[in-house]
């Protein structure tokens, strides 16, 4: 059978959604939302996962995230997994103190579902979760269906051989069990007959009968033993062969009975039992079962005609037997086909569940990769370990935290590409981005070889640190070697591209603080006085040389020749702070010797003539950004032994995870090996009644639509027709009452069929179709129809006995088939009342979805009625038949044999019903669990999209997620009209200090985090939705407007530039508000410019979105040459903004490094504010903001915890989800422990 969602005329929500809940409260639209603790917000997000997933029936549309500020969490976990809530696991030993600071959490924007932060809504497209293939995509032949009624076909298999093999293996245990039960039932019947014979028979048993009885019993016992003992080696094919052997044994017994060597009369009842068992209990394909059923029927009819002792007395009796066997074969075909269909449906649901869980793992892997594209592994490990140990009762006491690490004895390298500005004007966008990606990919490779950690790429600036996170005694040597290799590489670039480029490198040794600040566009960074010195060493250096400080020289221990650097002469900072500098002396021939990998590529490509931007075409080529995150192959990195010690045990599992049919099939094989169905049954289903232990789950199951209910009812109607035909061939002596009664029964059953299939006939009245729909969707109504159908068939089987006249029963003993006296009154053949009663019992088996306990109750009532009729009211009819037609060798009368036959059918039908109901309920459980996994997957996808939007603009994220990028170029884009803003805090350098009072600078960074977070919050207002934050550089905030493709064709061409100007004004107001609360006097120095830029994504391991061009350099210079507390713009920008309602003050002409050399001094203006409001800009209204990095990492931890909880349930409670499914690797693969890292700070309250 198939259990499907409701799809009635008026529609309905999916019934297997466990707890539909009302939508969460919205966050409101105030200009300043209430601040939240990130732990509280993330706990709310976690608890709302299923609420969002089930809202709207779990449809595939976009979903709005609720604002946790509006209301507290309202936990509605699915009942199926409600028992799986386990406490979080602590690390045990090895915990370290963590530094804390202030970050804020705000939910994602509403109104556009998964809309990106920069315009352009819609799903970013991580996974199309609701596009799973339908059953017809799997089946080779799904059967013939007409008006909702499914008719059997001979072939019912999957298209895929592997899928068919897995299906056969999946239900091998159940079919093995059915084979054993069938043989045991037959053996018990034989033993019962043997005991009755020994007790009741007047004469001893014929030796040949005893031998045959023992032989057939032995065969069936051996089959049972082989199937039970050798179950691990019993394949599906061998099980089919054992079924054939069982059928041969039973059919041979029919032959023996026909020859007079059986224990039951003429054996017609045993033939019916054999036919039913062949179709419903023996593990035979439908084609084999049909051939076996026809063979058994033909054998019995032949014996009845040819064997003298069994000779029938009329053609009507022969036809009645033929119709009887036809009816049993027809019902058996329906039962076998629809049962197999139900099992295949359950198997597909199992596969979908496994597939959903596999895809959930893939989503987790993507999320981990996204985190690792922002943070180094050791920081992620620190956050995960800390968050894993967060207890619910402590969440309320956790204040804003940041994760800042302090590392001593490190060396910092800054490198800048000289001549890059001119290069960016001569290359196309694609060539520029390709060149940068290849260049920085080589730098990343060199950094790995020289034990350096790349921190960030700032335009054409690259900086890295050695000694972080693993302390190294040779950190200074590593940076110097890194610098020398970079110079060799850039010189190779210069020789290949014919562009005048070089490297200016500065190195300083000391200590750093590292971590992530802000709420948007997370980027790992380092801060300290020593970082500033390294930066100034680079800017005051000489192209092609390595400029080092005295501190670095001391760490080199004289291993390199140096000369005076005279950095004070080239840089004001170095002169002001009296920093001694040196230049590494390196023989020119050493610099001309290229790195080994470049030499190999150059040799292999020596015949190339290429003066373009691409300089690497050899065997090595840089990876494309995000290929390891959103690519098709999602393989995980292995955990090192040291890194495993840093993770909680349940997060350090290792399993190679792939996606695709092969991996799904492997998972299903694991499921089969662990006999998951039996485990699910023990956990969720009651032993005898098979009802769910969870009442709400039972209610949902009972309301599931039964797609084969119409087919079952049609089959029951066919059985009634056969019963009518049998009793018409052997009619009652009173034809008129019999004709009336069967006419009424047929009309009643026809009405039942009509009322249950009416919804497929549009020509019928609407009220009738709605009634039909209601019946199909209502458990009680379906049961009423089922019981009415069974009652009609039962009445058809027994009602004719009411017209029998005891005085007119005629002896048939001495008549032959050719006798002139033909007696066709059914009262002369009372056993046919029993045979048709058996057909009525089989009607119960036809209704696959009927509860097995109800089936048992109905069967017991039938047997009780038959016992009443045969043993009391109509006992004389059966006794008269036995006296006249049975020999003295028959130790059982027709009454007793009939009750024994019905008892056999009762057990067989009940067991078959139990198997079918278990299959249906297992199917339902898999659906519920798969639905839960898909809902959780959707939440994870939203998490991933949030993370990706915090790395890339929304339209760029969609570029990487929606397209087939197998052969795609790097992402690059040219823009003609973009606004660029740099906002720095000049006073923060003087404010920053590394003393014991401020925890070695940590408290200063805590304040900087608050400032950046407030700036990020402003971007959550819809008036600034055209603005994208690019990065923070120390205490400098960089933002851009006009990047969204959707806004490029907007009528208000410079509306985004006006929004950028408004944003800069809002920043000045925000910093003033911060000054009030922190008792500081910070001022912003802001520079704005506009023009053309090149945007692109570079870096494979740590992808980074950036923009380049003269406009960027000019905006940066507008900041660096500006005045604190003022907003400086060039004349071109002034001319645009002055017509948009902004007021300015002319500053004058200033010298701008890198631009004035070619264009002379630049006229600049100070932006004062707005003269008049812009009518196109709405009043400030806060959109739900972004999740903080801590929030997303905690979401990842809680997702992994939920998986671990399910795994523990599977191991301890045998929940039936494959054990190996959750034994998975994580991406958190650090190089080793961090004994040199000092985690700074503790939890502290907000700043005053």
From Swiss-Prot:
Organism, as annotated: Rattus norvegicus
Q: What is its EC number?
A: 4.6.1.1
Residues engaged in binding Mg(2+) 1: 416, 460
Recorded GO molecular functions are: actin binding; adenylate cyclase activity; ATP binding; calcium- and calmodulin-responsive adenylate cyclase activity; calmodulin binding; metal ion binding; phosphatase binding; protein dimerization activity
Subunit details for this protein? Homodimer; via transmembrane domain. Monomer. Heterodimer. Oligemer; via transmembrane domain. Interacts with PRKAR2A and AKAP5; inhibits adenylate cyclase activity through PKA phosphorylation. Interacts with PPP2CA and PPP2R1A; does not mediate the inhibitory effects of PKA on adenylate cyclase activity; interaction is dependent of catalytically active PPP2CA; antagonizes interaction with calmodulin. Interacts with AKAP5 (palmitoylated form); promotes the phosphorylation of ADCY8 after store-operated calcium entry (SOCE) stimulation at membrane raft.
Q: What is this protein called?
A: Adenylate cyclase type 8
| Region ranges (Involved in AKAP5 and PRKAR2A interaction) | 1-106
Segment Involved in ORAI1, STIM1, PPP2CA and PPP2R1A interaction: which positions?
A: 1-179
What is the residue range of the motif Essential for CALM1 interaction? Answer: 38-40, 49-51
Q: How is the cofactor bound?
A: Binds 2 magnesium ions per subunit. Is also active with manganese (in vitro).
Per UniProt, what does mutating residue 178 to A do?
Answer: Does not affect the stimulatoty effect of PKA inhibitor on calcium-stimulated adenylate cyclase activity
Q: Which residue positions does Omega-N-methylarginine occur at?
A: 55
Q: Which cofactor does it need?
A: Mg(2+); Mn(2+)
Q: Which reaction does it catalyse?
A: ATP = 3',5'-cyclic AMP + diphosphate
